[in-house]
UniProtKB/Swiss-Prot annotation:
This is Fructose-1,6-bisphosphatase class 1. Pathway: Carbohydrate biosynthesis; gluconeogenesis. Signal peptide: none annotated. Its EC number is 3.1.3.11. The lineage of its organism: Bacteria, Pseudomonadati, Campylobacterota, Epsilonproteobacteria, Campylobacterales. Keywords: Carbohydrate metabolism, Cytoplasm, Hydrolase, Magnesium, Metal-binding. It comes from Wolinella succinogenes (strain ATCC 29543 / DSM 1740 / CCUG 13145 / JCM 31913 / LMG 7466 / NCTC 11488 / FDC 602W). Substrate binds at residues 87-90, 189, 220. It holds the Pfam family FBPase_C. Mg(2+) 2 binds at residues 84, 87, 226. InterPro entries: FBPase_C_dom, FBPase_class-1, FBPase_N, FBPtase, SBPase. GO terms for molecular function: fructose 1,6-bisphosphate 1-phosphatase activity; magnesium ion binding.
Length: 280
């Protein structure tokens, strides 16, 4: 039954790429559940996913990052899907890569029920990553997705992608990030979660960080839609994902749109994060 969901994600990708091109970064006057102004592409991508997933009987319900609550499709269905239809959509206006994220939960939403994840990257080409037993990369060519390779992270990487407002970082966090650059880590940060994490996965390792800061103590990235799906992917690829001290996949949410500080990366970098944050 998961295969039907994966195939539907593949079908949605070129249509969403199309609406990205058509929207040209145009905004509506509306805001989503967490106060972000919505692009036309956000809402059109959301509509595509909702319409296509409604055709799959095994999907019990959907929760979009663009909406406050859940949409129940089939009460007898097996899977709940949380998704961000267009992550990093503010980058559309400047023609940078953006993405779509899916978390597939069995029964009800919750880290312990997450059984598969996927994301799509819309850039010069379209790429898809699906994580279930392993993490598989697909490239869209000649009207279809072709399997490219299985992704696996090295023990230690070379990329540093530091998010959140730097002026609001804890001094110890800033000291840690600066130490990575002093060791020769390369800055690779676009402001889009999907392309930045995709870069680390493709290049074989590194660190993406979005800590709690004085302007957002609980972080900015949403657990169900962004943090948990990517935590699943990174762990399946041989890496790790924590909130500073605890595995993201051990966290519990109280609201559909809860946020969390998060760090994704190779084992070496995540252990260093843990050692820094144990002292805070």
């Amino acid at each position: 039954m998961l295969e039907a969901i994966f195939e539907k994600i593949k079908e949605c990708a070129p249509y969403i790429q199309g609406v990205i091109g058509e929207s040209a970064g145009e905004y509506f006057e509306t805001k989503n559940a967490t106060g972000d102004q919505q692009l036309k592409a956000d809402l059109k991508a959301d509509m595509i996913i909702e319409q296509e997933f409604a055709k799959i009987p095994s999907i019990k319900g959907l929760c979009s990052e663009e909406k406050e609550g859940c949409l129940i499709l089939n009460p007898e269905g097996r899977y709940m899907i949380a998704y961000d239809p267009l992550d990093g959509s503010s980058l559309v206006e400047v023609n940078m890569s953006v993405g779509t994220i899916f978390g597939i939960y069995e029964g009800e939403f919750g880290a312990k029920n997450l059984i598969a994840s996927a994301y799509i990257v819309y850039g010069p080409g379209i790429e898809l990553v699906i994580a279930h037993e392993k993490v598989e990369l697909y490239t869209f060519q000649f009207g279809r997705f072709e399997h490219r390779k299985t992704l696996a992270l090295q023990e230690k990487g070379k990329i540093n992608a530091p998010g959140a407002t730097q002026a609001c970082w804890h001094p110890k966090h800033k000291e840690f990030i600066d130490s990575l650059f002093a060791e020769g880590y390369r800055l690779r940060y676009s402001g889009g979660m999907v392309p930045d994490l995709h870069n680390i996965l493709i290049k074989g390792g590194g660190l993406f960080s979005y800590p709690g800061a004085s302007d957002n103590p609980k972080g900015k990235l949403r657990m169900l839609f962004e943090a948990l799906p990517f935590a699943f992917i990174f762990e399946k690829a041989g890496g790790a994902a924590i909130d500073g001290k605890k595995r993201l996949l051990e966290l519990e949410h109280s609201h559909l749109h809860d946020t969390t500080p998060c760090f994704f990366g190779s084992i070496h970098e995540i252990e260093r994060v843990r050692s820094v944050y144990q002292e805070l």
